[in-house]
């Protein structure tokens, strides 16, 4: 009975606090600036994507599409925008990987080297060549969609050992367990896990919410994470499949998951495709 009361209280607290909205920014020059993205007041977390090359001794490459060219030091001006976002209470993370890139980790030492690079160049460390300028980011997002899944657990561990809080997030595909990120997620070090419930018919919304809710409740709710997010495309054009109309999301799906203990909110791909979707769902998130 005591355990039941505790669980009930935690559910009540979760409902009262409400969820958050995370969004990916950086892959389309027409999506507006980072500062403008934060100024919409629609997002609590912004993932800057992507660091598309890293590991295996490669020189890391930051790809921000049409926004700026990091290779010629044109992205350091984003530091002021990052600072402005953080001043509004918005967490800003750097996303590793993405759907296209050349990235892999070949050993535990390789993972530690990548962690040190991230710390020195994007987090609380020091480097003469910080691609986004001097303002430190809040954390690192793992959007690993290519290569193998080895040693990402070691990367998560190394990022957690710098003596300063580094928020960690992961963006696995919804088929469970994720073939590349499950080992890292199982470390229990991730603050946020935003599962991509799209482009995967067996566990996405396809006119019916059954598969999605079964995946959420039976699979993903069992993982060791602080907060679990529902990852969705922000428009029908944002993904091949899995878009959920805002009215369906707010009336059928969010009421079924917001009371679950690990519910954290909704993640959207991406800012470019978000033409009012986040604003329309925000009151229900």
Where is each model-derived feature located?
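Chitinase-like catalytic core of GlcNAc-active glycosidases
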Residues: 17-252, 257-263, 272-285
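Cleavable N-terminal signal peptides of Sec/SRP-targeted secreted and luminal proteins
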Residues: 2-18
């Amino acid at each position: 009975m005591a355990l039941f009361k505790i669980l009930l209280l935690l559910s009540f607290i979760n409902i009262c606090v409400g969820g958050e909205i995370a969004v990916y920014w950086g892959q389309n020059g027409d999506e507006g600036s980072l500062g403008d993205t934060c100024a919409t007041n629609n997002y609590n977390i912004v993932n800057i994507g992507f660091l598309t090359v890293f590991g295996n001794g490669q020189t890391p490459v930051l790809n921000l599409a049409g926004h700026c060219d990091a290779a010629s030091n044109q992205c350091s001006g984003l530091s002021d925008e990052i600072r402005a976002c953080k001043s509004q209470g918005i967490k800003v993370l750097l996303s590793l990987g993405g759907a296209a890139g050349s990235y892999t980790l070949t050993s535990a030492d390789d993972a530690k080297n990548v962690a040190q690079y991230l710390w020195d160049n994007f987090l609380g460390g020091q480097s003469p060549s910080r691609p986004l300028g001097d303002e430190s980011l809040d954390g690192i997002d793992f959007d690993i969609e290519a290569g193998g899944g080895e040693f990402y657990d070691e990367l998560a561990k190394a990022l957690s050992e710098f003596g300063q809080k580094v928020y960690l997030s992961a963006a696995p595909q919804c088929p469970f367990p994720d073939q590349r990120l499950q080992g890292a997620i199982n470390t229990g070090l991730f603050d946020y896990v935003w599962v991509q419930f799209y482009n995967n018919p067996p566990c996405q919304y396809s006119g019916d919410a059954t598969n999605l809710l079964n995946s959420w409740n039976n699979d993903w709710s069992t993982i060791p994470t602080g907060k679990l997010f529902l990852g969705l495309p922000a428009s029908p054009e944002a993904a091949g499949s899995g878009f959920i109309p805002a009215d369906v999301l707010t009336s059928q799906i969010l009421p079924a998951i917001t009371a679950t203990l690990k519910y954290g909110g909704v993640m959207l791909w991406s800012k470019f495709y978000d033409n009012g979707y986040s604003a329309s769902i925000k009151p229900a998130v």
